[in-house]
Amino acid sequence: MKIEVCNVCKQFKKVEVLKNINMVFEDGKIYGFSGRNGSGKSVLLKIICGIYSPTNGEVLIDGKNYNRSNMFVPNLRALIEKPSFFPDLTGFENLKLLAQIQNKITEKEILSALEIVNLIDEKDKKYSEYSLGMKQKLGIAQVIMEDPKVMLLDEPFNGIEEESVQKISDYLLKQKKKGKIIIISTHIKEDLKKLADQIYYFDNGSVK
């Protein structure tokens, strides 16, 4: 799979938040987006996964513009902003409900995803009882259980303890070896230096 960001610009109320961005993402690599909050990195992730459309330019996935065709992007899953689940269901029940919609994810795969993010011991707690870090872990587990070809992760380690960060990082490195494309956006440079093959630095909508 190949993702091409071609001359992408994005404006909100005449404020230009992305300026003529060009990037190429290829199989078997981890890419990092680094920069201050509001620098444009999260906006680009949302454009790549189809939440936003670019004001100008295009994103091509294997040569196809899904933004323009308004189609669901296959084999791509994203953790964008704060994950959202049903508060009165447990972590496991939330993932099981999503798995039933997918109709191809087994209970074993759900439990494996929870194990990877160190949430297996809290799987039977209600989501409303989860801490910020636990909620973040559940969002990552959702992406993991769906086993996509492309993973977009926005501030994935926010509120997560070091032991779990290391475990999730090890998983991501294994997925890279399997040929997956992984894009991680974070303002914490140290997280990216340990994982990313290439880091893009965002500053006021431009990339260095």
Where are these regions (language model features)?
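Helix-to-loop junction immediately C-terminal to a conserved catalytic motif
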Residues: 49
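Conserved ABC transporter NBD signature motif
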Residues: 57-72
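Conserved ABC ATPase "signature" region
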Residues: 96, 107-122
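Catalytic Walker B motif of ABC-type/P-loop ATPase nucleotide-binding domains
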Residues: 151-155
